[in-house]
């Protein structure tokens, strides 16, 4: 669609805005313009709380909401029980890798979600009493829900990505989730980051307006943020919460030279992955393997990305 094209332009110009020392005002202006055009032309609107938390269609069905600008439909003849997106990220399904990996949110990020922000409901609270007090909507029937909470659920477990139709036991029904490639919400964040480069006050207004759709009691307010650096940090926190598990933040963190913080007091990361990186992580630069550049005269080891092996130190 034209809106998806505008969205791709917005993504590209936002990246290009940082290519020049001190920023490229023209690229940032175009990023904001294309992001706004994508919003307008698409006619799309941010997800509501009901759509976000729906145990049958949450983040698995493009036709169930008015948020997705671009996505891929998936049918059950294209997937197996474990080789698909749902099997890796939908914790309520009983057939996938999630029964072992139990993906969840970083505790430090969870603690930054405002109390009135309904995105809290994508992740199980460390207070287990909230699991059964009506705070959450779970997929499956009562028996399936009880089994999930008893054996698979842990504090901070993600329930953002639901098995299709809320089916937790039959993978041919629960696995074929539509693949989301671009939500209109991303355009709002691109616009505010680009606008912030020249008009911080307007960018704060844009973030406040967006967050009023997430913190429904109206209590969110970033007006006190004093400079561009602090605004970008706050904006990234909200963007991380918004797009957790969707693959959007990878490029933001590379572009803005942000690091990884997993080793800290009270961290919920497994020890083998609990490392900290100041600035972009070396593992984010993909390395072409030796067999490929030995067989392909068009590339060489000299032009390859550096091998990141051994550059990440895991604390004892």
Range-by-range predicted roles:
Residues 1-86, 99, 103, 110-316:
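Acidic/polar-rich alpha-helix caps and helix-coil junctions
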Residues 89-90:
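A low-complexity, Ser/Thr/Gly/Pro-enriched, surface-exposed linker/loop concept
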């Amino acid at each position: 669609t034209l809106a998806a094209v505008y969205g791709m332009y917005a993504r590209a110009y936002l990246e290009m805005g940082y290519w020049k020392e001190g920023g490229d005002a023209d690229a940032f202006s175009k990023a904001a313009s294309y992001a706004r055009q994508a919003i307008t032309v698409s006619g799309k609107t941010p997800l509501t709380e009901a759509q976000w938390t729906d145990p049958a269609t949450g983040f698995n069905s493009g036709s169930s909401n008015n948020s997705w600008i671009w996505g891929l439909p998936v049918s059950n003849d294209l997937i197996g029980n474990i080789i698909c997106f749902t099997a890796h990220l939908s914790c309520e399904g009983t057939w996938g890798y999630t029964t072992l990996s139990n993906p969840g949110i970083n505790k430090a990020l969870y603690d930054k979600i405002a109390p009135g922000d309904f995105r809290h409901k994508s992740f199980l609270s460390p207070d287990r009493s909230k699991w059964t007090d009506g705070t959450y909507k779970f997929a499956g029937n009562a028996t399936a829900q009880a089994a999930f909470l008893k054996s698979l659920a842990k504090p901070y477990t993600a329930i953002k990505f639901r098995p299709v139709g809320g089916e937790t036991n039959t993978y041919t029904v629960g696995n074929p989730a539509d693949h989301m490639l671009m939500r209109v919400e991303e355009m709002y964040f691109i616009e505010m980051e680009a606008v912030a480069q020249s008009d911080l006050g307007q960018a704060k207004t844009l973030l406040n307006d967006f967050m009023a759709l997430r913190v429904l009691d109206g209590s969110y307010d970033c007006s006190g943020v004093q400079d561009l650096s602090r605004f970008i940090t706050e904006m990234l926190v909200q963007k991380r919460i918004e797009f957790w598990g969707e693959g959007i933040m990878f490029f933001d963190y590379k572009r803005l030279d942000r690091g990884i913080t997993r080793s800290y007091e009270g961290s919920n990361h497994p020890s083998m992955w609990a490392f900290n990186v100041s600035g972009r992580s070396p593992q984010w630069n993909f390395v072409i393997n030796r067999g490929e550049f030995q067989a392909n005269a068009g590339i060489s080891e000299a032009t390859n990305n550096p091998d990141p092996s051994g550059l990440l130190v895991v604390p004892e």
